[in-house]
From Swiss-Prot:
Heme in keyword set: no
Gene Ontology annotations for the cellular component aspect, listed alphabetically: extracellular region
Keyword terms, alphabetized: Disulfide bond, Protease inhibitor, Serine protease inhibitor
GO MF annotations in UniProt: serine-type endopeptidase inhibitor activity
Keyword field contains Thylakoid: no
Name of protein: Bowman-Birk type proteinase inhibitor B1
Disulphide bridges: 6-53, 12-17, 26-33, 30-45
Species annotation: Hyacinthus orientalis
Amino acid sequence: GQQPLCNDCFACARSLCICGDLVPQCHEGCQQCEKVDTGKPLYQCRSFEDYQCAN
């Protein structure tokens, strides 16, 4: 399958993507994203590799 991009994430940490989308999107280097059930669109990056997150 194709890897999603995280163009619409508004905040990222070393292991997390916080996205405004309903679909998990990972920044380049974040190979997999999985939703964390917190009531917010919070996604945890799995198989993390160093990436940059522009504001």
